[in-house]
């Protein structure tokens, strides 16, 4: 017997229905923001992710990469942005003056230690808006990420936000930060000593070093923003206030990928025990398109982790109300000889927009009835010898227990005129 791979899981029954409900809710919300869905391959050449985050630990340590039969290195996507940017450039959208607003949804893969809310195959839903850069767009995108989560009934959330400034700010600060940490190099943990050489800002993320006094006293990037970048960031903060977004300025927030500029943010959930869980995050990336060989084209985006969202929603009313999709009609066929007449009825109802099912085994009436009612149909349609001989069907309301017998040709009009089904 085979078992599922560590860090993966199966979705079925109630959980699957809840996932679909959340997915459909998010798609409907994104459509209201005039976002267009984009679907990129699950597999890309390794260089796509190397280009997007060459110093990231995600690329160096966590990706599933393999050589194909022609010795080309292929990577299962660990995140959604890089594939969208590759597609944007490959399809020459960077050469248009149009603002492109995308959303994506699908599985991603990272080889990391499985834990609660974190898997080796996981799902991201994300937004990427390409072609413009200004504080107003930052505000709407951050507010959208915030609204997406709140609209699911998860209200105790906070946006943590920082600015990495423009390229000039970023490069200047890297040198200031490095010079400061040089004197504390021996106090860094082994991982942060490695980060010191390759991706120094990730030291801010370290759980071991983050509480050390020397890091708490380190220079803050906010204090080194050039004037234009500071004005822009203050406009973003003011905009978030006007949009009633609950946010917190977080000077040590840098995000895990090294292509970000200007506004970066994470959305955290504050549970009843006082613990926080990161549900998603994102930021601006003014220079990412040029790294892929495209024309300068700034962008901003975010991604939310579906598994984290679903683990919280499991205890919320969003997934507990009407969790199972309703079945309008179950046609109970008493004997095999009547099956195709029952199937024809089910097909007719389906063509008219009603959900219908029927039995494929023919047990005693009491056993068949018991199995039919387990499907929780709104109406039970009984096709027995009497009904068959007279081209009739007996319809029973499973809630009120009232029943009536009508001609089979009138079934559709009966359902169309029934308020419970419309």
Curated annotation (Swiss-Prot):
- One GO BP annotation of this record: histidyl-tRNA aminoacylation
Q: Which Pfam families match?
A: HGTP_anticodon, tRNA-synt_His
Write down the InterPro entries for this protein, in alphabetical order: aa-tRNA-synth_II (IPR006195), aa-tRNA-synth_II/BPL/LPL (IPR045864), Anticodon-bd (IPR004154), Anticodon-bd_dom_sf (IPR036621), His-tRNA-ligase (IPR015807), HisRS-like_core (IPR041715), HisRS/HisZ (IPR004516)
> What are the entry keywords?
Aminoacyl-tRNA synthetase, ATP-binding, Cytoplasm, Ligase, Nucleotide-binding, Protein biosynthesis
Which subcellular locations apply to this protein? Cytoplasm
Task: Offer a single GO CC term for the protein.
Answer: cytoplasm
Annotated EC = 6.1.1.21
Please verify whether the record's keywords include Ribonucleoprotein.
Answer: no
**What is the superkingdom listed in this entry's lineage?**
Bacteria
Q: According to its UniProt record, which reaction does this protein catalyse?
A: tRNA(His) + L-histidine + ATP = L-histidyl-tRNA(His) + AMP + diphosphate + H(+)
For molecular function, the Gene Ontology terms on record are:
ATP binding; histidine-tRNA ligase activity
The family assignment reads:
Belongs to the class-II aminoacyl-tRNA synthetase family.
The subunit field of the Swiss-Prot or TrEMBL record says: Homodimer.
**What protein does this entry describe?**
Histidine--tRNA ligase
Source species = Onion yellows phytoplasma (strain OY-M)
* Gene (name only): hisS
């Amino acid at each position: 017997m085979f078992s599922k791979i560590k860090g993966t899981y199966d979705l079925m029954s109630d959980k699957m229905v809840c996932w679909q409900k959340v997915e459909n809710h998010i798609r409907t919300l994104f459509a209201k923001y005039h976002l267009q869905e984009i679907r990129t391959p699950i597999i890309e050449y390794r260089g796509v992710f190397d280009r997007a985050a060459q110093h990231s630990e995600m690329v160096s340590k966590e990706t599933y990469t393999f050589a194909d039969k022609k010795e080309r290195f292929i990577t299962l996507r660990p995140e959604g942005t890089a594939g969208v940017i590759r597609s944007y450039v490959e399809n020459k959208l960077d050469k248009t003056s149009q603002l492109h607003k995308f959303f994506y949804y699908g599985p991603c893969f990272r080889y990391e230690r499985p834990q609660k809310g974190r898997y080796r195959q996981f799902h991201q839903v994300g937004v990427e808006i390409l072609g413009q850069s200004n504080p107003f767009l930052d505000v709407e995108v951050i507010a959208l990420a915030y609204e997406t989560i709140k609209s699911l009934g998860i209200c105790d959330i906070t946006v943590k936000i920082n600015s990495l400034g423009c390229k000039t700010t970023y490069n200047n600060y890297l040198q200031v930060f490095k010079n400061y940490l040089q004197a504390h190099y021996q106090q860094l943990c082994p991982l942060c000593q490695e980060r010191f050489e390759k991706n120094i800002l990730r030291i801010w993320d370290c759980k071991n070093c983050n509480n050390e006094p020397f890091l708490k006293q380190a220079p803050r990037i906010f204090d080194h923003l050039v004037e234009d970048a500071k004005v822009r960031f203050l406009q973003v903060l003011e905009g978030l206030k006007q949009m009633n977004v609950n946010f917190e300025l977080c000077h040590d927030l840098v995000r895990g990928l090294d292509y970000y500029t200007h506004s970066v943010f994470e959305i955290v959930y504050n549970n009843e025990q006082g613990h926080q869980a990161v549900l998603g995050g994102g930021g601006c990336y003014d220079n990412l398109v040029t790294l892929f060989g495209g024309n300068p084209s700034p962008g901003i985006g975010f991604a939310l982790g579906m598994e984290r969202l679903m683990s919280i929603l499991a205890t919320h009313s969003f997934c507990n109300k009407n969790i199972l999709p309703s079945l309008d009609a179950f046609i109970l066929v008493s004997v095999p000889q009547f099956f195709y007449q029952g199937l024809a009825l089910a097909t007719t109802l389906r063509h008219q927009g009603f959900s219908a099912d029927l039995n494929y085994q023919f047990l005693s009436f009491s056993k068949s009835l018991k199995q039919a009612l387990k499907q929780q149909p709104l109406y039970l349609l009984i096709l027995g010898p009497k009904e068959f001989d007279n081209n009739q069907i007996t319809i029973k309301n499973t809630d009120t227990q009232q029943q009536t017998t009508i001609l089979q040709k009138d079934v559709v009009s009966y359902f169309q005129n029934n308020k419970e089904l419309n």
